[in-house]
């Protein structure tokens, strides 16, 4: 959600800023801008719309400089206008900001009384004026920033430069990701490593409360008490190829097709261990797992659906009660606390604000044991978790999550079996059987991917529809939810999902010839129940699109379309059936001509409430 990039070097940094912002587009945005300090003067360009349009304007105006900052904005305070786009300027102070300032109205009134005139509706402009105010009181840029952040309530990542101090820029972090890149005689700042990968692989992750001074010849970092501190230097393993399309038309398509490989990468430790040892989740996991009596999962969006799937596995395989809750709901209610329950948070980015705050809330309530499942090392949620298990999905650029979701499912399945083995609910034979199912999973997923031409053929049937209904039962109900979410996210077709058994309790009223109904119908113990639900749809003139197993014994007829995946894959069937609903959403969006990788109004990393 929003993106920051900044650079100071002995070369022209404008190409670095533009390329960095392009690599941050996946986070979601509606406007962008850069500002540079050139020959003692500030030059700025801002545009609504795509970064490419802003970049053309910067080129036409001949931007070139050795110091600059840039930003992609996802509107929160104020509409999508050029005046509200970043960077903001106040009397030679230039600033970009991610986050939300909660007390901006109070500060705005205060600054207006001092004579400051506001040009935008944003909370960000308040910070620029505030920093200038403290500089007027005799402070330098860094000191003014440190004074300003003490006056702010909320979350932020900031990069600031001043016309009065052309040899450096400064930054600050509280609640929003921000990292520093170290180059050879040049330094950078960004909200995401992908923005800097073309310039450096050496990065330092700032912590909450940190401020920093960024110079060509080095950096200085200060903690919340303004004391100098050292933060660890990391070497990023993100590759440029993982951030490029290659042979694919969209990142979403690429990431769907990467799933056999990333699933194999994620399960590699279990395969190497020939089982599901607790150490997959950290050195202290065994002692923690032995003492727990239940699981509480907290997540948002697609990660929440992964948690819903995990509940079936954890209760059936490990014999432990499992609750799953949307993080943004959990954090605002008086929740039940059992110190012997393990709190599991799931987040692709590791920075999802509601999930992060829900975890902090759970710990404050008295939950002692926490596990983070995340795709981003050194992000905020893992840093405050007792146990960590990283998915190995690699960078996910498409806003609609695909490979991050299925790798989360693999980790959650491993958790269920590890708990089952430790509790004696799974014997050696059962563990070996689960391991074999896991080993076969990448091949099964590849077979599902081979169905893409057939699924693309269905997309024409959906492209002119305004609504769709997804049905599933048991383990596959969360996959129906995920399918509906994917369709609405990228094709803008209103879609809902229900347990198939709930049809007659309301959703059946929606069914008619104009309502396509997608059914996930594996050959499991609930298949006959699902077939009965399908008959209810057919009796009302509904058109059925069924994803079935090879041996589910469906025959196509008018109003009944069937794509067979493969023979039933047991408890891992939800992962295999995820692939067809991803492909259906993708190809429907293609036919409708929407922006697949950057759907309107959405952001990849949701770092505000």
Swiss-Prot record:
Location of the Glutamine amidotransferase type-2 domain: 2-217
GO biological process: carbohydrate metabolic process; fructose 6-phosphate metabolic process; protein N-linked glycosylation; UDP-N-acetylglucosamine metabolic process
InterPro entries in the cross-refs: GATase_2_dom, GFAT, GFAT_N, GlmS/AgaS_SIS, GlmS/FrlB_SIS, Ntn_hydrolases_N, SIS_dom, SIS_dom_sf
Residues annotated as catalytic: 2 (nucleophile), 604 (for fru-6p isomerization activity)
Pfam families on file: GATase_6, SIS
GO cellular component, one term: cytosol
Major place of residence: cytoplasm
Keyword Repeat: yes
Catalytic activities: D-fructose 6-phosphate + L-glutamine = D-glucosamine 6-phosphate + L-glutamate
Key words of the record: Aminotransferase, Cytoplasm, Glutamine amidotransferase, Repeat, Transferase
E.C. number: 2.6.1.16
Disulfide partners: none
Listed GO MF terms: carbohydrate derivative binding; glutamine-fructose-6-phosphate transaminase (isomerizing) activity
Coiled-coil blocks: none
Subcellular location: Cytoplasm
Annotated ranges, domain SIS: 285-425, 458-599
Catalytic class of the enzyme: transferase
Subunit structure: Homodimer.
Role summary: Catalyzes the first step in hexosamine metabolism, converting fructose-6P into glucosamine-6P using glutamine as a nitrogen source.
The protein's name in its UniProt record: Glutamine--fructose-6-phosphate aminotransferase [isomerizing]
Organism: Xylella fastidiosa (strain Temecula1 / ATCC 700964)
């Amino acid at each position: 959600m929003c993106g920051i990039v900044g650079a100071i070097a002995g070369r022209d940094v404008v190409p670095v800023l533009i390329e960095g912002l392009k690599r941050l587009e996946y986070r979601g945005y509606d406007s962008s801008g850069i500002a540079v300090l050139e020959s003692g003067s500030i030059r700025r360009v801002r545009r609504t719309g795509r970064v490419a349009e802003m970049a053309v304007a910067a080129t036409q105006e001949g931007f070139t400089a050795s110091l600059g900052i840039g930003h992609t904005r996802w509107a929160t305070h104020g509409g999508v206008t050029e005046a509200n786009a970043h960077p903001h300027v106040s009397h030679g102070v230039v600033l970009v900001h991610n986050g939300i300032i909660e007390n901006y109205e109070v500060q705005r009134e205060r600054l207006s009384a001092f004579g400051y005139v506001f040009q935008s509706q944003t909370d960000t402009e308040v910070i620029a004026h505030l920093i200038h105010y403290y500089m007027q009181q005799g402070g330098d840029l860094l000191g003014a920033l440190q004074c300003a952040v003490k006056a702010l309530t909320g979350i932020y990542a900031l990069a600031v430069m001043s016309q009065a101090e052309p040899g450096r820029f400064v930054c600050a972090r509280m609640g929003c990701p921000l990292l520093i890149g170290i180059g050879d005689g040049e330094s950078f700042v960004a909200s995401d490593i992908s923005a800097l990968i073309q310039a450096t692989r050496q990065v330092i992750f700032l912590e909450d409360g940190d401020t920093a001074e960024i110079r060509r010849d080095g950096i200085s970092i200060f903690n919340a008490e303004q004391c100098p501190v050292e933060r660890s230097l990391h070497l990023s393993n993100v590759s440029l190829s993982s951030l490029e399309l290659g042979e694919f038309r969209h990142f979403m398509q690429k990431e769907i097709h990467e799933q056999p490989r990333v699933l194999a990468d994620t399960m590699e430790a279990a395969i190497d261990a020939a089982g599901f040892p607790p150490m997959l989740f950290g050195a202290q996991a065994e002692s923690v797992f032995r003492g727990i009596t239940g699981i509480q999962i907290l997540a948002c969006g697609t990660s929440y659906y992964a948690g819903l799937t995990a509940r079936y596995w954890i209760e059936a395989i490990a014999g432990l009660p499992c609750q799953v809750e949307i993080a943004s709901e959990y954090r605002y209610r008086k929740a039940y606390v059992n110190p012997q329950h393990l709190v599991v948070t799931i987040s692709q980015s590791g920075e999802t604000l509601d999930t992060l705050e829900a975890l902090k809330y759970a710990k404050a309530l008295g939950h002692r044991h926490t596990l983070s499942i995340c795709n981003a090392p050194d992000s905020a949620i893992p840093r405050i978790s007792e146990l960590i298990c990283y998915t190995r999905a690699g960078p996910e650029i498409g806003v609609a999550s695909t490979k991050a979701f299925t790798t989360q499912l693999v980790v959650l399945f491993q958790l269920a079996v590890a708990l089952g083995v430790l509790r004696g609910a799974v014997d050696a034979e059962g563990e070996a059987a689960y391991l074999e199912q896991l080993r076969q999973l990448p091949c099964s997923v590849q077979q599902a991917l081979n169905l893409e031409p057939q699924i693309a053929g269905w997309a024409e049937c959906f492209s002119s529809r305004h609504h769709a209904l997804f049905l599933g039962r048991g383990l596959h109900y969360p996959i129906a939810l995920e399918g509906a979410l994917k369709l609405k996210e990228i094709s803008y077709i209103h879609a809902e999902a229900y347990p198939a058994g709930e049809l007659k309790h309301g959703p059946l009223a929606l069914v008619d010839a104009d309502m396509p109904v997608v059914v996930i119908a594996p050959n499991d113990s609930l298949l006959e129940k699902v077939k009965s639900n399908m008959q209810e749809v057919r009796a009302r003139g509904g058109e059925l699109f069924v994803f079935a197993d090879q041996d589910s014994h469906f025959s196509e007829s008018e109003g009944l379309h069937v794509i067979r995946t493969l023979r039933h894959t047991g408890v891992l069937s939800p992962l295999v059936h995820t692939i067809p609903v991803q492909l259906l959403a993708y190809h429907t969006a293609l036919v409708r001509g929407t922006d697949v990788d950057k759907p309107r109004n959405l952001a990849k990393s949701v770092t505000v409430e």
